[in-house]
Amino acid sequence: MKFVCPLIVVRDMEVSRAFYEEVLGQKVGYDLGENVSFEGGFAIHLRSHFADLIGVDEDDILRGPKNAELYFEEDDLDAFLERLNGMDSVKYVHGVVEQPWGQRAVRLYDPDMHIIEVGEPMESVVRRFLARGFSVEETARRTSMPEEFVRQCA
């Protein structure tokens, strides 16, 4: 068996597709009308159609349960954050935070209240610590990454 992708349910395909394309820079792989797959490896599916497929009432499909997130990485997190600041429609779970392992991330909601996390790649985190003068060993401890990974990032 092969896992293909996560699929999230959306109320308005046009609004959600615009969010993923314009806010998160995702590219559409396939547009099948009620289902849109993105090259990033996830899909959105129209709620009314999904409810019919699984045989439930639309109202039985939860909105914003806060029990999962889609995770993205952005090489230039600061530029992304600056771009977000100009978008009044973006609703935040929280602003940028530094996780205990040193990674900076922001969480926001998509139009259907799915949680979206955008963080910097761990390679960037490691390089930032090394640039601050941390040793390979200190960086590995601080980031919880193996020393070999830290050396490869140097």
Model-derived regions, located:
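Vicinal oxygen chelate
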Residues: 1-5, 26-75, 81-109, 121-132, ...
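Major-groove recognition helix of helix-turn-helix-like DNA-binding domains
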Residues: 147-154
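Long, amphipathic alpha-helical segments that form or neighbor coiled-coils/leucine zippers used
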Residues: 116-117
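Long, low-complexity interaction regions most often at the N-terminus
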Residues: 2-8, 15-19
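Helix N-cap motif at beta-to-alpha junctions
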Residues: 12-13, 75-77
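Conserved beta-strand-loop-alpha-helix junction that forms the acyl-donor binding cleft
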Residues: 10-13, 100
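Conserved active-site tyrosine of GNAT-family acetyltransferases
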Residues: 16-21, 84, 113
